[in-house]
């Protein structure tokens, strides 16, 4: 049933019918390989983002004891995921899960972009006020003098939850006054966690876009206020892109080459598009045509799919095709794609597959039972990626058209959050997933 008025869009009628029915699908991007837009980040931009996180590692280790075992690096394990394979996908290459759900402090992929943007801001303010020079030890940013300086500044962000956690944890630790505008989709425990860190949480009855807009408007009227714009921030995007170097080192250590004979498939949950767009950009810069990035969106919130499939020239919302943007995947409940990441994904994403809430909870159960990983629903969205390629006509056509031998491929499924979720929430997720499986068995 359609929940919003439908706006005429240049969408294929068959695709539109599938979207409006809420049916999971795989859409292949015909624009992959087109030239990047002029505003695309440069190689120097990527290098500087990596250098910033490296020089600030000591600072992060000082601020957060959880990061000391990693020397302050924002890094997550790459876990073999062969137990996820079903009998019908047994020959589909080597599978891994990228465990950003286990990232310390923020507990999600958003630590990569969020920490990078806050660190860039802190460096800029401190350099302007003479607290640090270009080559100085960044641990000086944790000094009392720096804390007093940052306390005169505000950091503000709009979020469905995880980006707010990332920004809020680091900005407040450095001393910034921090304000997070949270949409109705945000979980109560995320709001509570921020408040215990002294973060001002502003709750909104509307969706993600309304929370972001409210934050943007408030920030515009405040002196010394930096707004982290999830819909268009280059600093967030570049922070996500740094994950490519980390993954490349892990794949090399695992003995998985990436080249014409050994393609890499990366499956990423997608909300507004910044995190998957940044990671795709970093991977494409490193591997070119040998990496194939597929993004996963809820059937109720396929904002990137709708944007790309409609041609990409003008902003398009899932509301324009009659969808309601309501899903248990709170981190992916976004109605309109990023105006920064969208055009970059248009040129670089291999495709988009959608997942309904029942599939999300089935994937959650698989992650728990087969890999011993507890995830939040959003983080499980990409687990169906390899199956779409092996088990659908569109997926098999994609492989055939590129001469890809499935057995030679490496699949990386990005798990984006879950380690900070309270135990009671995890029990609720698992109970729902188990009940759903029992119902499916009874109806079989």
From Swiss-Prot:
GO molecular function: D-serine ammonia-lyase activity; hydro-lyase activity; pyridoxal phosphate binding
Similarity comment: family membership: Belongs to the serine/threonine dehydratase family. DsdA subfamily.
HAMAP family: D_Ser_dehydrat (MF_01030)
Identification of the protein by name: Probable D-serine dehydratase
GO terms of biological process kind: D-serine catabolic process; isoleucine biosynthetic process
UniProt cofactor(s): pyridoxal 5'-phosphate
Keyword Lyase: yes
Catalysed conversion reaction: D-serine = pyruvate + NH4(+)
Keyword set, alphabetical order: Lyase, Pyridoxal phosphate
UniProt modified residues of type N6-(pyridoxal phosphate)lysine: 110
Record flagged with keyword Metal-binding: no
EC number: 4.3.1.18
Lineage: Bacteria, Pseudomonadati, Pseudomonadota, Betaproteobacteria, Burkholderiales
Gene3D superfamilies (alphabetical): 3.40.50.1100
Pfam families: PALP (PF00291)
């Amino acid at each position: 049933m359609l929940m919003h008025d439908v706006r005429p869009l240049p969408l294929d009628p068959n695709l539109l019918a599938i979207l409006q029915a809420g049916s999971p699908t795989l859409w292949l991007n015909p624009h992959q390989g087109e030239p990047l837009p002029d505003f695309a980040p440069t190689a120097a931009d990527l290098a500087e983002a990596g250098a910033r996180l490296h020089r600030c590692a000591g600072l992060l280790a000082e601020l957060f004891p959880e990061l000391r075992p990693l020397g302050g690096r924002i890094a997550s394990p790459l876990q073999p995921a062969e137990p996820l394979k079903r009998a019908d996908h047994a020959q589909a290459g080597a599978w891994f899960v990228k465990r950003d759900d286990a990232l310390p402090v923020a507990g999600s992929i958003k630590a990569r972009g969020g920490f990078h943007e806050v660190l860039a801001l802190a460096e800029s303010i401190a350099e302007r006020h003479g607290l640090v020079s270009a080559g100085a030890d960044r641990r000086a940013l944790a000094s009392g003098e720096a804390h007093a300086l940052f306390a005169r500044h505000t950091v503000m962000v709009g979020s469905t939850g995880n980006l707010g956690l990332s920004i809020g944890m680091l900005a407040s630790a450095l001393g910034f006054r921090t304000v997070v505008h949270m949409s109705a989709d945000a979980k109560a425990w995320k709001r509570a966690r921020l408040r215990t860190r002294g973060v001002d949480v502003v709750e909104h009855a509307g969706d993600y876009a309304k929370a972001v807009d409210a934050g943007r408007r408030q920030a515009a009227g405040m002196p010394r206020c930096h707004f982290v714009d999830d819909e268009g921030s280059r600093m967030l995007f570049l922070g996500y892109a740094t994950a490519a170097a980390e993954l490349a080192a892990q794949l090399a250590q695992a003995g998985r080459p990436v080249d014409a004979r050994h393609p890499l498939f990366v499956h990423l949950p997608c909300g507004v598009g910044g995190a998957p767009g940044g990671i795709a950009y970093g991977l494409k810069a490193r591997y070119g045509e040998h990496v194939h990035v597929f993004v996963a969106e809820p059937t109720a919130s396929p904002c990137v799919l709708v944007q790309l499939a409609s041609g990409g020239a003008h902003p398009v919302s899932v509301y324009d095709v009659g969808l309601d943007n309501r899903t248990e995947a709170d981190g992916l409940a976004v109605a309109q794609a990023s105006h920064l990441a969208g055009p970059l994904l248009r040129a670089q994403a291999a495709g988009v597959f959608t997942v309904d809430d029942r599939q999300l909870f089935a994937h959650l159960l698989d992650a728990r039972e087969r890999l011993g990983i507890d995830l939040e629903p959003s983080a499980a969205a990409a687990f169906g990626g390899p199956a779409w390629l092996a088990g659908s006509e569109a997926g098999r056509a994609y492989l055939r058209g590129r001469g890809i031998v499935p057995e030679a491929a490496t699949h990386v499924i990005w798990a984006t959050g879950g380690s900070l979720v309270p135990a009671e929430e995890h029990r609720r997720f698992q109970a729902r997933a188990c009940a759903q499986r029992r119902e499916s068995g009874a109806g079989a």
